[in-house]
């Protein structure tokens, strides 16, 4: 009987300790989770061309040129493609589109749409995001596009190939972005209908505002 009582008392003590330590453990876990989230962000700079990058990074002209060249190649691979110049101009504005050779990855039915000219139309690269130039290593880069058509949701903004906005189309800025923002985007395999890219930008902007609102609400409740 005495042994049984001792076991019960021990269980009670363990239960009491667990109940009182759990909030502390949760608090510590939350701190580490927040730290992990902060570390998931990456500081990037927005440039219009290699010269802008070189001016901001003295002695790194070669790295800046390479990053710009890679961004241009990435833009050709991932930018929205249009079957006609008119469709592209309607989205991005006059003087903001260029022809690009038909890609092997584009579906045959879409290649047929551009058979008359033998090429597709895509927006010019308006700028690019570049990660920090760490000693010796090459920085990541991501091409950015911008519309000059006031009717487009992408008007005056920097957007990536997926339609995600990174604010006003003003080079020289530095900002924090999720590391996923710098990940390579999938190659464009189909042509976009007129206004299609703008719809993607509008949807992405709505999602970003919703996420920002949820974060602010959570912080207010936590604070």
UniProtKB/Swiss-Prot annotation:
Disordered: region residues: 165-223
Family statement drawn from the similarity comment of this UniProt entry: Belongs to the UPF0441 family.
Protein name per its UniProtKB record: UPF0441 protein KPN78578_33850
Organism the protein comes from: Klebsiella pneumoniae subsp. pneumoniae (strain ATCC 700721 / MGH 78578)
One Pfam short name: DUF1190
Residue ranges with Low complexity bias: 177-193, 209-223
């Amino acid at each position: 009987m005495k042994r049984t009582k001792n076991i019960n008392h021990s269980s009670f003590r363990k239960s009491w300790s667990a109940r009182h330590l759990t909030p502390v453990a949760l608090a510590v876990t939350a701190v580490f989770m927040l730290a992990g989230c902060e570390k998931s962000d990456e500081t990037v700079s927005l440039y219009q061309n290699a010269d802008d990058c070189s001016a901001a990074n003295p002695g790194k002209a070669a790295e800046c040129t390479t990053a710009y060249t890679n961004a241009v190649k990435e833009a050709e691979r991932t930018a929205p493609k249009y079957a006609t110049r008119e469709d592209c101009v309607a989205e991005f504005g006059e003087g903001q589109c260029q022809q690009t050779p038909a890609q092997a990855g584009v579906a045959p039915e879409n290649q047929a749409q551009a058979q008359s000219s033998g090429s597709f139309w895509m927006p010019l690269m308006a700028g690019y995001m570049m990660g920090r130039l760490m000693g010796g290593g090459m920085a990541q880069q991501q091409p950015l596009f911008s519309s000059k058509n006031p009717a487009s949701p992408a008007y005056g903004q920097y957007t990536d190939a997926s339609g995600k906005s990174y604010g006003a189309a003003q080079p020289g800025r530095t900002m924090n972005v999720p590391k996923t923002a710098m990940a390579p985007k999938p190659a464009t395999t189909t042509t976009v209908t007129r206004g299609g890219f703008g719809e993607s930008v509008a949807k992405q902007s709505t999602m970003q505002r919703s996420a920002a609102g949820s974060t602010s609400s959570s912080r207010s409740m936590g604070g």
